[in-house]
Amino acid sequence: MVEIQTGLRENTVGAVEQFAEIASIDPLVASMILSGAIIITVAVVAFGALTLGAIGASIKRGLSGSEEPNQPA
């Protein structure tokens, strides 16, 4: 188990160092990596918020005790 954790840590640090080395070659490459990171972060936050909202609505509906969801008339 310790070997797996050590290998994961070394691979992660190695990947970060490699991305930093590639990004330092050209400002255009650095801006592309940064824009990709921003897009991924926005997507993760948006889908995380949607997931938490769905879980919260499901829990709220379960705690209210109603058998059927509210339907428009």
Curated annotation (Swiss-Prot):
Its main location: membrane. The chain crosses the membrane at residues 37-57. It is a single-pass membrane protein. One of its GO terms (cellular component) is membrane. It is found in: Membrane. Keywords: Membrane, Transmembrane, Transmembrane helix. This is Uncharacterized protein NP_1057A. It comes from Natronomonas pharaonis (strain ATCC 35678 / DSM 2160 / CIP 103997 / JCM 8858 / NBRC 14720 / NCIMB 2260 / Gabara).
